[in-house]
Amino acid sequence: MSKKVMSVVILAAGKGTRMCSNLPKVLHLLAGKPMVQHVINTANQLDCTRIHLVYGHGGALLKEKLNNEKLNWILQEEQWGTGHALQKAIPYFSEDENILVLYGDVPLIEVDTLNRLLLAKPHGGISLLTARVDNPRGYGRIIRKNDDISGIVECKEATEIQKKINEINTGIMAINSSDLKKWLKQLKNDNHQNEFYLTDIIKMAYQENRKIIGIQPAHLNEIEGINDGLQLARLERLFQKQQAEKLLLSGVRILDPARFDLRGQLICGSDVVIDTNVIIEGEVTLGDRVQIRTGCLLKNCRIGDDSQINAYTVIEGSFLDKNCVVGPFARLRPGSELSEKVHVGNFVEIKKSSLGQGSKAGHLSYLGDAEIGSGVNIGAGTITCNYDGVNKHKTQIGDYVFVGSHTQFIAPVTVGDHATIGAGTTVTLNVPENELGLSRVKQKNIQGWKRPKKT
């Protein structure tokens, strides 16, 4: 293809009735992102000047979910076929530019395949992505004469002989805008669906002796569309398998690729081990020799070298330095920072707090809006009472503080270095360094007391 300005058109106006959902089809999630987002991301990797999105059902929600994208939004109020969708885009095409047609429900198309398609486009002709499949049911068939592509017949219009053809149309094509405009204006809807088929322009091109080149995808799953929940689930597993295989080949040890979900971007150091049923969301970085045990959810976090995340731990928006141990059943909420060799045990929740080097919170604690120094021991059942019903307040604990079990810090409050907090204390006043803070009620023993008996 000669070097010309190129625009991408993504068709995404379908209602997706077979999804049995009020959500627009192209907003259903694949690997944590709307399926149309995958197509947009792919288009953004091409040498294109503009991306047009033809939308219809659920337009307001589409714009809300894709508000960060630089798109030209084109409304198709009535869905009268793929040809009709492209007709709506005609006013936005520049003269003599190349147009690449993509589909919002075909999310796994690869950049390399599209680049091959664009390079193969002949001058004055069309390059068309086709595929040979074992079961062509539901797809339009490629019609050839003397091995040249002469047309496409939609499945519902095909004869019994044509239905035996196993070369299918994917709908993805590259075409010059001037030719596309001309042929779109000639489309008719005299077919079983009363729709304007984009595929009819292939016959028009052939009748004008234009060259039509068929290109095959590198992998068949690239051209699979999503029309129902079953197809979505199938492509989800295919995509997750692909991602797991790439990580395995890079040296990451994933114990069971079939039970691994990556819904974002994962960067791993060497000798990382990921157990079963781990979910990665957003941008996650794992250092060297990190171990992630079964059932963990990691989202937008960084975990330092030689750290271990034990089973069923949730970490979001947090930073962990080297040699940390977290979990099982722990939760690190956004804004949490753990320095080297910090231990956070089972049923500990940390929110917007920092723990200094070597500090430990072993079990059953809530630490919110806290700044905790190095070498601190947090006893079981410790709570920072950070909320007064209106505002959040901070708890500051110095280095080498010992906090006894079942302690409550009524923030704002400060505890100095090397202080000790007795078990069961409610801390309402600042505790100076090296002092013992204690608010325990004096114990009283009642002699001769007997338990009541059942009557």
Swiss-Prot record:
Organism: Hamiltonella defensa subsp. Acyrthosiphon pisum (strain 5AT)
UniProt-annotated stretches for the region Linker: 230-250
Entry's family note: In the N-terminal section; belongs to the N-acetylglucosamine-1-phosphate uridyltransferase family.
Protein name, entry field: Bifunctional protein GlmU
Chain sites annotated for binding Mg(2+): 105, 227
Entry-linked HAMAP family: GlmU
Region (Pyrophosphorylase): 1-229
Cofactor binding summary note: Binds 1 Mg(2+) ion per subunit.
Positions bound to acetyl-CoA: 380, 386-387, 405, 423, 440
Pathway: Nucleotide-sugar biosynthesis; UDP-N-acetyl-alpha-D-glucosamine biosynthesis; N-acetyl-alpha-D-glucosamine 1-phosphate from alpha-D-glucosamine 6-phosphate (route II): step 2/2; Nucleotide-sugar biosynthesis; UDP-N-acetyl-alpha-D-glucosamine biosynthesis; UDP-N-acetyl-alpha-D-glucosamine from N-acetyl-alpha-D-glucosamine 1-phosphate: step 1/1; Bacterial outer membrane biogenesis; LPS lipid A biosynthesis
Subunit structure: Homotrimer.
Binding positions for UDP-N-acetyl-alpha-D-glucosamine per the UniProt entry: 11-14, 25, 76, 81-82, 103-105, 140, 154, 169, 227, 333, 351, 366, 377
Protein purpose: Catalyzes the last two sequential reactions in the de novo biosynthetic pathway for UDP-N-acetylglucosamine (UDP-GlcNAc). The C-terminal domain catalyzes the transfer of acetyl group from acetyl coenzyme A to glucosamine-1-phosphate (GlcN-1-P) to produce N-acetylglucosamine-1-phosphate (GlcNAc-1-P), which is converted into UDP-GlcNAc by the transfer of uridine 5-monophosphate (from uridine 5-triphosphate), a reaction catalyzed by the N-terminal domain.
PANTHER family: BIFUNCTIONAL PROTEIN GLMU, NUCLEOTIDYL TRANSFERASE
Cystine pairings recorded for this chain: none
Keywords: Acyltransferase, Cell shape, Cell wall biogenesis/degradation, Cytoplasm, Magnesium, Metal-binding, Multifunctional enzyme, Nucleotidyltransferase, Peptidoglycan synthesis, Repeat, Transferase
Main location per the UniProt record: cytoplasm
GO molecular function: glucosamine-1-phosphate N-acetyltransferase activity; magnesium ion binding; UDP-N-acetylglucosamine diphosphorylase activity
